[in-house]
C-alpha cells in the first residue's frame, strides 16, 4: 500500500514540477502540453523497469509446496468446476463487499474524470467559451487558458495529497481491530471529503477534502480483499480473487459509460456543465 501510494505521489507531482522548472504546461488546441508528455514518458519508463524487476525477483511457490500450505489434496485437484458454479457458491462476503466496491470505484472514476473541470471552474475561475457542434451551441471551459492548465497542475498536487493521506491512514487502519468498522469509517470519511469539494473554493482548503478521500482510498486497496480471503475456504482462492477484480473493472466501465449522460441532466442551457455535481 505504501509503495502504491508513493508511486502515485511521484506521478501526480511530475506535471507540477515540470511546469515549475519552466517546461510549458500550455499548448494550442488539440495539442498535449509538454509537461504532460514528459510525465507520461517518465511514468512509462518507471512502469517498465518495475515490471522487469518484479519478474526477475519474485518467485512462485512450487505446486507441491502451495498445495501443502493450503491443504489441497490430490483428490480435490481432480474436482472440476466453472466460474458460474463458483459464483453461486460464493460466500456472502463476496457479494456484500462487491456491492460496496461497485459504488466506491464508480465514485473514484468520476473523481478522476471530473476533478480537473471542477477545480478549474470553482477554484481558478477558468473563463468559458461558446462552441458550435452540429448546429448546437455549448458553453465549455477554455481548456487553452492559463487558468485551466494551472488547475490541471494543481489537481496533480491534490491527488498527491490524497496519496499522502492514504499512507497515513493506512498506518491507522491496523489499530482498528474490527475490519468492518475500519472499512465503514474509512468510506464515511471519504464520502465527507467528496461532499466538501462542492462547498470549497480555495485551492489550499481542498487539501482537507483530499486527505479524507485518501482515507477511503487506503481502505479500498487493503480491506476488501482481506475481508474476502478470510471468508474463503478450499482451493479456489485464486479464482475468487480474480472474479472479485470484476468489482473494480465493471463499476468503472459503467461510470465511464453513463457519466456524460448524468452530467448532461445537471447542465442548464447556456451554462457550463457543473462537473462538481459528479463529485
Regions flagged by a language model, labelled:
Residues 1, 219-233:
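Intracellular juxtamembrane helix-capping segments at the cytosolic ends
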Residues 1-3, 232-244:
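Loop-to-transmembrane helix entry/capping segments in MFS-fold secondary transporters
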Residues 2-23, 245-256:
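Glycine-rich segments within core transmembrane alpha-helices of 12-TM secondary carriers
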Residues 20-45, 261-279:
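A membrane-interface helix-boundary motif in multi-pass transporters
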Residues 34-35, 125-163, 278:
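Loop-to-transmembrane helix entry
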Residues 189-201:
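C-terminal ends and interior cores of transmembrane alpha-helices
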